[in-house]
Amino acid sequence: KVTLVVRDEKTASGRIHVGSLRGVVIHGAVSRALSEAKLPSAFFYEINDFDPFDDIPSFLNREEFERHLGKPLFAVPAPDLPAPAGALRADGQAGGTPENYAEYFGGEFIAVIKRLGFAAEFYRASALYREGRMNDAIRIALLRAPLIARIYEEVSGAKREKNWLPVSLVCEHCGKIGTTKALSFDGERVKYECGNFVEWAVGCGRGGAMSPYNGGAKLLWKAEWAAKFFVLGVDVEGAGKDHSTKGGAREIADRIAREVYGIEPPVNIPYEFFHVGGRKMSTSRGAGASAREIAELLPPKLLRFLMLYKDPARVIDFDPSADTIPNLYDTYDSYAEEFWKGGAGDYAKIFRFSHPRADARGLGERFLPRFSEVAYLVQMPHLEFLKEIEKMAGRSLMAEDKQEAEERAFYARRWLESCAPEKYKFEIQKALPAAAKALREEQRKALARVRALLEANPMADGQTLHGKLHELKTELGIAPKDFFSALYLSLLVTLAVRYGGNFYGQFLDYHLFPFSIIFPFWVIV
């Protein structure tokens, strides 16, 4: 075979959740690895716009969309909402009003995929059917329907009724596909009726007989999955954990591929769920963080890294309102160091694949300031950001160092404004906080000694000062909690001005203590 085909797809039933990017990144990385191994490959990505509209996302007006339940997604009007930023039309071009529901949400997702640097070949499921590319697969499935029904029963235990056919017709009268039932096939046309066969949509009560070809019908999805393997010649296609379990959809599709279509199914790469804050995502219900929302919180290389650095068999638990993002940056930085040291192991490979092939400059060595320290510095208007980064680096900054620092500052501000935990947020107060008045005498005396310590050691670095503070605490015999809570309340701004983020990082690593008030100690002592 000249070109190996890697494929993935997503149904555009609503705002597509970030978990769907795991499949995108895995398949994109496989395609790249094949190409680098001198094995030509193509990465096909399908926006499935032919599935029935079966649920209304919570953020849409139910009364407005209820009458469209049961229609193919491409036949449902686009929501009357602002066009998603960067969304692409079916022809791959930017701008314009999305022509239907599937294009509204699918276009938004395609824009995220392109931003991540994956050169996928996008297509729509409706085009496969309407252009006749699925005709042979439909004919074979209809003629071998009893075999498909037997496979369903043997794999999952689900018994199909007599004369069952694995297709849904698009009703000639109401245009719905989710409410029809195929009754018989005479070799040319399928007889069907449109009724109340599902709980989520209402049929028109009519029926007829029509050709199932050229978009008149679609295969039911497990049979359709195998048919796409057959029609597109797919060699690699992974699937989520829920589909890849024993007796699941993938096992059924693989058997249909072999026994009905006479082909070997593609290599499967089962991958685990992506949780946001411990919850599994749902596209059609509008539950969870969308791909676009998370893509706005992280630069492309970090989002790619997030999807790659854990084994596909492990759950990714991502909580932007906790420590996940600072920890993710720290992990990325450790992988970068391994790559720059000339390592050839998994860390170095994952770091390289976290950058698009076209981004060779992004692989160049640079200073990587800790994200948690950057998040602190951007909240300190009295500090010159790049000067503080230079102090951390211990050398003059090159252009790539500045670019990296400024990118991290941009995303740190975005994170702080949207969802960062309170412990990462700081505010310089202009008036004495009420809590400062409650400091006990021993705390005030301790602060006076700290002031003297600072004045006596004006050039001490953060690490040295950290040690001297511990010595002072021991000498005074003050409880650690009382000593450090007074420092947090009254002293941190002074230390930040004098020692910059270097002190902040070392200090907070040892003494994480939630607070939101910073006040100069000299007001108290």
Where do the model's predicted regions map?
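A structural motif corresponding to the C-terminal end of an alpha-helix
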Residues: 37-40, 108-121
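Active-site cores that bind ATP or allylic diphosphates and position pyrophosphate for catalysis
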Residues: 114, 118-270, 275-291
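Residue-level signal for inorganic ion chemistry
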Residues: 17, 141, 299, 487
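Basic, alpha-helical terminal appendages of large translation-related enzymes
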Residues: 1, 13-16, 42-44, 157, ...
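N-terminal catalytic cores of NTP/NDP-binding nucleotidyl/phosphoryl-transfer enzymes
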Residues: 1-58, 226-245
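Charged, often glycine-rich, active-site loop that binds/positions anionic groups
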Residues: 50-67, 137-138, 142, 280, ...
